[in-house]
Amino acid sequence: GGSCGQCRVKIKSGGGDILPTEMGHITKKEAKEGCRLACQVAVKTDMELELDEEIFGVKKWQCEVISNDNKATFIKELLLKLPEGEDVHFKAGGYIQIEAPAHVVKYADFDIPEKYRGDWDKYGLFDIVSTVNEDVLRAYSMANYPDEKGRIMLNVRIATPPSANVPAGKMSSYIFNLKAGDKVTISGPFGEFFVKETDAEMVFIGGGAGMAPMRSHIFDQLKSKKTKRKMSFWYGARSTREVFYQADFDALAAENDNFVWHVALSEPLPEDNWTGYTGFIHNVIYENYLKNHKAPEDCEY
């Protein structure tokens, strides 16, 4: 417990002193206001607490898989259809939880496009079998933005075993095996990674499947809210084959003078003929933007 920091509550009375395990997720100011992690609070006496209003809006739906396509070598875009007339009332940057029953999944059954199969063969991934003997629940950020109604879009990276003694990712293995028409149970919405209502410059930094909340935020700001705040998006990938939604972000940059986006490749391939930024994205944004920024501390990240 205490590792994800998602179960924040405000304790008005009771609950005892805040624990060291909580301080990595809660600032000193928040602690003074009674903020705690519910999983770390021992209930020994009567308590009074305050919950965010959004919690009471959490619902559960059985969705249908519309598509489950590779967007990169190890990343799928899972697109789910909500029941007719239903919608998830979420804020950009929010997440849902997805349920998986006990299952046995053979990686050989995954639908992987030919252009990506070479890497899967190289690492022997099609030989993996994921056996899960209990129900599993995992959280994923939504890649769609609130005005994309009636559906849920997720970017999921397969969690392959780091060694022979460690099992494959229970949920990612389940998700990678989903096919159009399959039924999936989700619940939500949840989240705290929301844009603040200020005029501050926004700097979005992400890589890999971390694309999901970036897409949600940026599309929401530019397509729905029509913000004029200065915005930049810095995305890291291994090679051009691992970059997705490129045409969408190119179009947004062309349509909005206040938005630019940059890609940095850590391992560009010879056929990429890459002339852009290279290296890891956190180093690239520092060296090429934040190092000489007038007031990086004033930006919203």
UniProtKB/Swiss-Prot annotation:
Catalytic activity: a ubiquinone + n Na(+)(in) + NADH + H(+) = a ubiquinol + n Na(+)(out) + NAD(+)
Keyword annotations from UniProtKB, A to Z: 2Fe-2S, Cell inner membrane, Cell membrane, FAD, Flavoprotein, Ion transport, Iron, Iron-sulfur, Membrane, Metal-binding, NAD, Sodium, Sodium transport, Translocase, Transport, Ubiquinone
Binding site residues for [2Fe-2S] cluster: 4, 7, 39
Top-tier EC class: translocase
Signal peptide: none
EC numbers: 7.2.1.1
One matching Pfam family: NAD_binding_1
Classification via InterPro entries: 2Fe-2S_ferredoxin-like_sf, 2Fe-2S_ferredoxin-type, Beta-grasp_dom_sf, Cbr1-like_FAD-bd_dom, FAD-bd_FR_type, FNR_nucleotide-bd, NqrF, OxRdtase_FAD/NAD-bd
Cofactor note: Binds 1 [2Fe-2S] cluster.
Compartments it resides in: Cell inner membrane
Domain FAD-binding FR-type: 58-196
GO biological process: sodium ion transport
Recorded GO MF terms: 2 iron, 2 sulfur cluster binding; metal ion binding; oxidoreductase activity, acting on NAD(P)H, quinone or similar compound as acceptor
NCBIfam families: nqrF (TIGR01941)
Record text on subunit structure and interactions: Composed of six subunits; NqrA, NqrB, NqrC, NqrD, NqrE and NqrF.
Family assignment from sequence similarity: Belongs to the NqrF family.
Role this protein plays: NQR complex catalyzes the reduction of ubiquinone-1 to ubiquinol by two successive reactions, coupled with the transport of Na(+) ions from the cytoplasm to the periplasm. The first step is catalyzed by NqrF, which accepts electrons from NADH and reduces ubiquinone-1 to ubisemiquinone by a one-electron transfer pathway.
Name of protein: Na(+)-translocating NADH-quinone reductase subunit F
Originating species: Shewanella putrefaciens
